[in-house]
Amino acid sequence: MAAKDVKFGGDARQRMLRGVDILADAVKVTLGPKGRNVVLDKSFGAPRITKDGVSVAKEIELADKFENMGAQMVREVASKTNDVAGDGTTTATVLAQAIVREGAKAVAAGMNPMDLKRGIDKAVIAVVEELKKNTKKITTPAETAQVGTISANGEHEIGEMISQAMQKVGSEGVITVEEAKGLHTELDVVEGMQFDRGYISPYFITNAEKMVADLDNPYILIHEKKLSSLQPMLPLLESVVQSGRPLLIIAEDVDGEALATLVVNKLRGGLKIAAVKAPGFGDRRKAMLEDIAILTGGQVISEDLGIKLETVTLAMLGRAKKVRIEKENTTIVEGAGASDDIKGRCGQIRAQIEETTSDYDREKLQERLAKLAGGVAVIRVGGSTEVEVKERKDRVDDALHATRAAVEEGIVPGGGTALARASTALGNLHFHNDDQRVGAEIIRKALQAPLRQIAHNAGEDGAVIAGKVLESNDYNYGFDAQIGDYKDLVAAGIIDPTKVVRTALQDASSVAGLLITTEAMVAEKPEKKAPAMPAGGGMGGMGDMDF
């Protein structure tokens, strides 16, 4: 086992604080509308330019083991805030730095660290309640757009696009962000259920120009197994031909004689038909086929349920207004399923989302829910260069998360104002001793840190700005760093999602409290490497020999 290096008390805290400062100073330059960019070196490809706090935090690794521990703890703050709220990582980092700094001073002055932490925790609970009390719910698309615009660093186009996407797919729809191939950023909304399987054979195409198969008002056969022979389903095919409507077959696979027969019938014009493979794999495939069946009002033809192809009737098939099949995607529009059944299925999926502990499973369940309940929107981010596209994509991701958070929990005035004003809640608290009171005082000072940093990044004096803002009794009155003026921030559209502000404070105080109460640190001692052998220069003592 390698030897360990141990540091105690003030020495440990000082080393840790240096690490906290290095990471926080690199992250906090990005805060606010006039925050700067940070360039991240990559081991391959061009450097990455970003204004995303968590991306900067994740890149920082310090040589000194003790300093690195402090930096990693604050990195954890940024990551946790990002996971829960999706934005506010820089605010959380600034708060954590402020709490740790003030806390370290208090401990050095002889305060009890555990009482300080209790005071900090009590103060944070009071501030969170104050934030909730002053929260305003979002009701209009314009307010949604404002939140997106603020988080995208004042880019109005992005805010508008996110607002449109949320209107179209609803609160449970899925919105994804991708890189576009062109210069422009665009919004693409898929209505209905789309899954990533295309036609099995290009002979099913109905529109050769666009390379798609369009089926209007089709029947949909949902089969769990592979189809190799059509013999068992001939009675069903005859019924479909008599009805004069097209047929879509969704099965594990269609091959051999079955595929050849379908293609020949399609080409001769006797049967309007198309076949696609079932989406997903294993148990997820069964669940997705069940989703399609509920959406279209059909049944999954499965031998597990005792249903054989020979006994299938038209009543067991699903129906939809339109189906479009492309090379790699199939979209079912306006399925004929009963709305109560669809709602019931959505409730079932929501319950599974609540129960699952896997992020991957949660994401897949969320996608299934969106396909049933809302729809899917894709924001394709464009730009002149790859570096620009990546930087914009970071901002769009942040804006999207912030907007979702705002719809979920409401909004408060932005620009760090809500936190600074929430310190009024600390006046009525009662503490068991003076050390706990000092803990609350640490939070009171830290609450001004984001407002001061936003002002500082805009080239103003943070202390003067904070003082001027807190002089006013108007809750919405604050500093607009973009213009350098004081105004009603909510009316001006400068707003923050309550969830983002709340999460940033809770995560920052949690980790900062742990750092303050640290009394010893243990790290691996760097091994002293033995000096390398000198370059070989022949045998010594032979230089003056005669040959």
UniProtKB/Swiss-Prot annotation:
EC number from the UniProt entry: 5.6.1.7
SUPFAM superfamilies: GroEL apical domain-like, GroEL equatorial domain-like, GroEL-intermediate domain like
Reactions it catalyzes: ATP + H2O + a folded polypeptide = ADP + phosphate + an unfolded polypeptide
Keyword Amino-acid biosynthesis: no
GO annotation (BP), single: protein refolding
One Pfam family hit: Cpn60_TCP1
Protein's UniProt keywords contain RNA-binding: no
GO molecular function: ATP binding; ATP-dependent protein folding chaperone; isomerase activity; unfolded protein binding
UniProt-annotated binding residues for ATP: 30-33, 51, 87-91, 415, 496
Gene Ontology CC annotations of this record: cytoplasm
Compartmental location: Cytoplasm
Record keywords: ATP-binding, Chaperone, Cytoplasm, Isomerase, Nucleotide-binding
Classification via HAMAP family: CH60
Biological role: Together with its co-chaperonin GroES, plays an essential role in assisting protein folding. The GroEL-GroES system forms a nano-cage that allows encapsulation of the non-native substrate proteins and provides a physical environment optimized to promote and accelerate protein folding.
Family to which the UniProt record says this protein belongs: Belongs to the chaperonin (HSP60) family.
Assembly and binders: Forms a cylinder of 14 subunits composed of two heptameric rings stacked back-to-back. Interacts with the co-chaperonin GroES.
The protein, known as: Chaperonin GroEL 1
